[in-house]
Regions:
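Conserved, structured core segments of small domains
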Residues: 1-120
């Protein structure tokens, strides 16, 4: 099963500490070695993006930044055996933020990607 993990958070007053990046790289290496991490990348702030909306039959393009209070920060695509395994990887990632960047607040949404098993 594939799971997409989307990290979002507030824009804190302090930049992330270098130790956090080192720990994230180590965890990513471990997930890659285990064969479960398929792709991951950071995302630029929404100010550099756009949104295409459809409402009432009309399409609208809106340039960022978007008004949501939390920014999408990064994504990761995992292939794991179960939802529980996906949650374990996501939890480990969030624990790094808790332990190495006190005061930072955010969330990781873990969404299953549709696959052949969903079209039975």
């Amino acid at each position: 099963m594939r799971y997409l993990m989307l990290l979002s958070g507030t824009n804190p007053a302090t930049p992330p500490p270098p130790e956090l990046f080192e720990a994230i790289m180590k965890l990513g290496g471990e997930a890659t070695e285990a064969g479960v991490l398929l792709d991951t990348a950071g995302l630029l702030p929404s100010a550099s993006g756009a949104r295409v909306s459809l409402a009432g039959g009309s399409m609208t393009v809106t340039d960022g930044p978007f008004t949501e209070s939390k920014e999408l920060i990064s994504y990761a695509l995992y292939e794991v055996r179960s939802k529980e395994e996906a949650i374990e990887w996501g939890s480990r990632f969030m624990k790094l933020h808790r332990d190495l960047w006190p005061g930072w607040e955010g969330k990781t949404d873990i969404l299953q990607v549709m696959g052949p098993e969903n079209f039975g």
